[in-house]
């Protein structure tokens, strides 16, 4: 039978051709054939990520198997609306205890008084805070893409879809963050209701206390987006945003935190969290995935026990890899500042035609990464940076001592030696043991 999906004129033609070819293949199969194909694809994904490749993309991680197993324990399909102790449905005695345990662990790990664990993504976590602090038509100030500012804070993302006007924050290019003095002048001019900090690449601590002073001076709230920094914050290897003045922290739970896909909001501001709670229920979340909540709780336990060691190892390993790549002659961004104080850093990617082109060269060697914006000259038709991170490889057992070898693989793959690098990466994966920094 022909595919039910039809061509979408608004999608790039090459992508849509690919989509429709997959749809046609699925439409031509019977039910058993589709089931077999899904199983095959799941196995193929496992091969790509877990048997033959190394993830250097800080936007992903590997889960504690005990946490991952909770996703298939029959929890997620049980509707769970309302507050523990007074749920709309009955039979939720176990699930509501899981919800409370997850929130308690989140509050412990992030040093907060309140935690909202029902959010299904980091983007929605940001939207909840936007809705709790602003009204459509209000102005916010957010980091621009040149310093890793995420789309959810801008016109094409949650902020714009909610009707907010985003003004890009002024940039401190050397520190890969905002310029606090210039921000103060801008805030007096545009009168924002919310100022955000944090993004898709974080190299050095952001000036959160100074930004809070700016926010207070114009009556704004301060949101710290820890989508990528959540693990570093949880492991106390990064300044604590709530202690430094952020009104709330939002995050994804599957990046450096190494949990299931989803979002999380923590705060010490009771009035703000009361508004966020009403947005979550009965507003936009209503019923949530209890399986994800259980997996999140199990993953947060890793941070309660091993968080400091894991975060410190990530920072040390990222710094070692950045220095090793510099020794290979590669253009590591922010050399004058020591490259990074976090779990991630970037290469200037113009030499390879841009970050996405460079990432495709790395993929030929079994090394998975992606592009990122940097406050340097643009690259026509591509992103000007290549983002690298170490959360997953550290959990797999890589240490700073392994970074010269990894840097050599990266350098060779970027110059066209992907085939030989891929063979060496596959062999190295066969010698890896169990995961580190997890509670078994």
Swiss-Prot record:
Q: Which residues carry this modification: N6-(pyridoxal phosphate)lysine?
A: 255
The protein's name is: Alpha-methylserine aldolase
Keywords for this protein: Lyase, Pyridoxal phosphate
The encoding gene:
msald
| GO (cellular component) term, any one | cytoplasm
Q: Which Pfam families match?
A: SHMT
Any Gene Ontology biological process: glycine biosynthetic process from serine
Question: What molecular function does GO assign, one term?
Answer: pyridoxal phosphate binding
Task performed by this protein: Catalyzes the reversible interconversion of alpha-methyl-L-serine to L-alanine and formaldehyde.
Supply the EC number(s): 4.1.2.-
Spell out the reaction equation it catalyses: 2-methyl-L-serine = formaldehyde + L-alanine
Q: Which cofactor does it need?
A: pyridoxal 5'-phosphate
Q: How does it assemble?
A: Homodimer.
Q: Which family does it belong to?
A: Belongs to the SHMT family. Alpha-methylserine aldolase subfamily.
Q: Which domain of life does this protein belong to? A: Bacteria
Q: Which InterPro entries match?
A: PyrdxlP-dep_Trfase, PyrdxlP-dep_Trfase_major, PyrdxlP-dep_Trfase_small, Ser_HO-MeTrfase, Ser_HO-MeTrfase-like, SHMT-like_dom
């Amino acid at each position: 039978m022909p595919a039910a999906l039809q061509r979408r004129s608004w999608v790039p033609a090459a992508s849509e051709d690919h989509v429709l070819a997959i749809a046609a293949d699925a439409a031509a199969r019977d039910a058993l054939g589709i089931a077999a194909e899904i199983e095959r694809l799941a196995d193929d994904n496992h091969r790509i990520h877990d048997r033959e490749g190394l993830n250097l993309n800080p936007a992903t991680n590997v889960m504690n198997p005990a946490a991952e197993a909770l996703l298939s324990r029959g929890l997620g399909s049980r509707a769970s609306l309302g507050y523990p102790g007074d749920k709309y449905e009955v039979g939720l005695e176990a699930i509501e205890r899981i919800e409370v345990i997850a929130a308690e662990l989140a509050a412990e790990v992030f040093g907060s008084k309140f935690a909202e664990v029902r959010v299904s993504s980091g983007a929605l976590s940001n939207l909840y805070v936007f809705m709790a602090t602003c009204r459509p038509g209000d102005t916010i100030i957010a980091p621009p893409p040149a310093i890793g500012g995420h789309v959810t804070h801008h016109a094409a993302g949650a902020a714009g879809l909610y009707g907010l006007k985003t003004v890009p924050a002024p940039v401190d290019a050397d520190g890969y963050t905002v310029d606090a003095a210039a921000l103060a002048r801008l805030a007096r001019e545009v009168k924002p209701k919310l100022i955000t900090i944090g993004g898709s690449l974080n190299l050095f601590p952001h000036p959160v206390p100074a930004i809070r002073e700016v926010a207070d001076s114009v009556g704004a709230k301060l949101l710290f987006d820890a989508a990528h920094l959540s693990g570093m914050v949880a492991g106390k290897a990064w300044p604590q945003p709530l202690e430094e003045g952020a009104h709330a922290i939002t995050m994804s739970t599957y990046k450096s935190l190494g949990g299931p896909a989803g979002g999380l909001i923590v705060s010490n501001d009771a009035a703000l969290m009361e508004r966020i709670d009403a947005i979550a229920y009965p507003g936009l979340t209503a019923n949530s995935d209890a399986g994800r909540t259980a997996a999140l709780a199990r993953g947060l336990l890793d941070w309660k026990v091993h968080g400091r060691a894991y975060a410190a190892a990530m920072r040390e390993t990222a710094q070692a890899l950045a220095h090793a790549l510099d020794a290979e002659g590669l253009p590591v961004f922010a050399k004058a500042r020591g490259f990074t104080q976090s779990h991630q850093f970037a290469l200037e990617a113009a030499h390879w035609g841009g970050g996405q082109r460079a990432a495709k060269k790395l993929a030929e060697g079994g090394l998975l990464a992606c592009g990122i914006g940097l406050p340097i000259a643009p690259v026509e038709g591509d992103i000007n940076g290549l983002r690298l991170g170490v959360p997953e490889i550290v959990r797999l057992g890589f240490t700073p001592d392994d970074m010269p070898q990894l840097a050599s693989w990266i350098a060779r793959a970027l110059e066209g030696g992907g085939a030989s690098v891929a063979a060496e990466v596959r062999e190295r994966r066969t010698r890896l043991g169990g995961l580190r920094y997890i509670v078994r």
